[in-house]
Amino acid sequence: MSKFLLYWFVYGVVCSAAYDILKAPNYFEEFVRQYNKQYDSEYEKLRRYKIFQHNLNDIITKNRNDTAVYKINKFSDLSKDETIAKYTGLSLPLHTQNFCEVVVLDRPPGKGPLEFDWRRFNKITSVKNQGMCGACWAFATLASLESQFAIAHDRLINLSEQQMIDCDSVDVGCEGGLLHTAFEAIISMGGVQIENDYPYESSNNYCRMDPTKFVVGVKQCNRYITIYEEKLKDVLRLAGPIPVAIDASDILNYEQGIIKYCANNGLNHAVLLVGYGVENNVPYWILKNSWGTDWGEQGFFKIQQNVNACGIKNELASTAEIN
């Protein structure tokens, strides 16, 4: 790395970690310019500033107490509840067909490699952006199938989240869904098209799927029960990247590093578990989000292992076998 790039890397980290609450008005005006924010009135702008100030204080506190680094980002003028409501989407479906088999992992975890990352094998597709549509469940589910396809065929493809939003009769589109029910819906539909044939619209629409263009189907799906968080390592290595449910409340302003303190108050978001590692004797999980590459570590984030950070082991992990 050149001295120039190293300087800007260090400068960026220091700046994001060393905010001054007294400079909140300046930060806000820069935020408005950077993200081209448009407010309907001065009253609305003031209201958003107060939310921004509250979030800034939270960022400063996190940077003081956590090993991860947090920064002002595109969510910083939204309340936590607003962001969760607009940019996540894990929720109960209207009904479930229970196609997925429940697998109990009751043996203690065995010994495996200290580090593992599916990205190193080129089995993870690019980070996407769900926008203001509560379809995290579709993004995480299809991200896992994209990886399954890459493992089987040594080729990366992008599947259609819009097909899931429009045609999945089990989940409820941009209003939310679950991981295992998304797999069940794919079994019912018969398969999924690629994104180019059924592009993403970030909103609900009528179903336009073409079964003659399906490229991936689901043969069967499994849901895993275990009291051992570390057992996820075995599933990850043997079955491929895993869509998991988390509480996203404490990751909204994340920039980089290992999150040690993460709320576990209720699952509201779905992401893809792609790997794990150890840094300064702290074991961590690597997860792929669906908030674009301008969030986190180019769209990825890390949380500490074995403390149930963000509630990662609260919900049954789901995987699927493609056909």
Curated annotation (Swiss-Prot):
Record has Signal as a keyword: yes
SUPFAM superfamilies assigned to the protein according to its UniProt record, in alphabetical order: Cysteine proteinases (SSF54001)
- EC primary class: hydrolase
Q: Name one GO molecular function term.
A: cysteine-type peptidase activity
The UniProt PTM text for this protein says: Synthesized as an inactive proenzyme and activated by proteolytic removal of the inhibitory propeptide.
The residues that the database entry marks as glycosylated are N158
Q: Propeptide-annotated positions?
A: 19-112
Q: Which residues form the signal peptide?
A: 1-18
Supply the InterPro entries for this chain. Papain-like_cys_pep_sf (IPR038765), Pept_asp_AS (IPR025661), Pept_cys_AS (IPR000169), Pept_his_AS (IPR025660), Peptidase_C1A (IPR013128), Peptidase_C1A_C (IPR000668), Peptidase_C1A_papain-like (IPR039417), Prot_inhib_I29 (IPR013201)
Q: Where is the active site?
A: C136, H269, N289
Cite the EC number: 3.4.22.50
Catalyses:
Endopeptidase of broad specificity, hydrolyzing substrates of both cathepsin L and cathepsin B
Q: Which superkingdom, per the lineage?
A: Viruses
Q: Does the keyword Disulfide bond apply?
A: yes
Which BP terms does GO give this entry?
proteolysis
Concerning PROSITE patterns, the annotation shows: THIOL_PROTEASE_ASN, THIOL_PROTEASE_CYS, THIOL_PROTEASE_HIS
Pfam families in UniProt: Inhibitor_I29 (PF08246), Peptidase_C1 (PF00112)
Q: Which UniProt keywords apply?
A: Disulfide bond, Glycoprotein, Hydrolase, Protease, Signal, Thiol protease, Zymogen
Disulfide links within the chain? C133-C174, C167-C207, C262-C310
User: What exactly does this protein do?
Assistant: Cysteine protease that plays an essential role in host liquefaction to facilitate horizontal transmission of the virus. May participate in the degradation of foreign protein expressed by the baculovirus system.
Record family assignment:
Belongs to the peptidase C1 family.
Q: What is this protein called?
A: Viral cathepsin
The taxonomy runs:
Viruses, Viruses incertae sedis, Naldaviricetes, Lefavirales, Baculoviridae
**Gene responsible for this protein:** VCATH
